Amino acid sequence: MKEKIIHHPELGEIHLVRKRGIRRLSIKVGAENSIRVTIPWLFPFAAGELFLKQSEGKINTILRRMEKKAAERTPILLPSDPIALRAIKKDARKALATRTMELALLHGFVKSDGTPLIGRIALKDNKSNWGSCSAKGNINLNIRLHLLPPHLRDYVILHELCHLRHLNHGPEFHRLLESVCPMHLTLKKELNRFSIK
């Protein structure tokens, strides 16, 4: 993989990435308006720059849509006061870890000896997701979950627990999520009204 960063006068920093094993040029607009152009390995970076130029209108449409969605969302903000922030982090660590273990045991995310499948639970303050699960069974939860309503916290935790069995979002994952959280589609929509940025 080779990467080149260019600065576009309107779009800002653009990452051009040449990768092996891909056949088409593609553009991804990510969190905080990051833009990545993926280029097949045998193509020059100039091909990516041309593709970017041809796609400017589409990118601007996507950015406007993202801005509109962000404006409609309620941001979940952490306090700027260090003492209050420390207190929230302390409470969150205990409460989210305890609730994750409770839900794991309640819904059968356990080994044959009855212990939870979870490797470890870590709290992070990231801007891209509410939670994640690794192939080793480690669950990372966004500290801001602690500031959400309890039913949304449980939804995110259950979503990550389902990844202990299925590390993708395929049909089996969705069947399992449906079985442990029948209202997951409604809860996902409700969660999307909140922003972690």
Question: Predicted regions span which residues?
Answer:
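Active-site-proximal or metal-binding-adjacent scaffold patches in catalytic folds
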Residues: 1-155, 164-197
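Walker B catalytic acidic pair
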Residues: 160
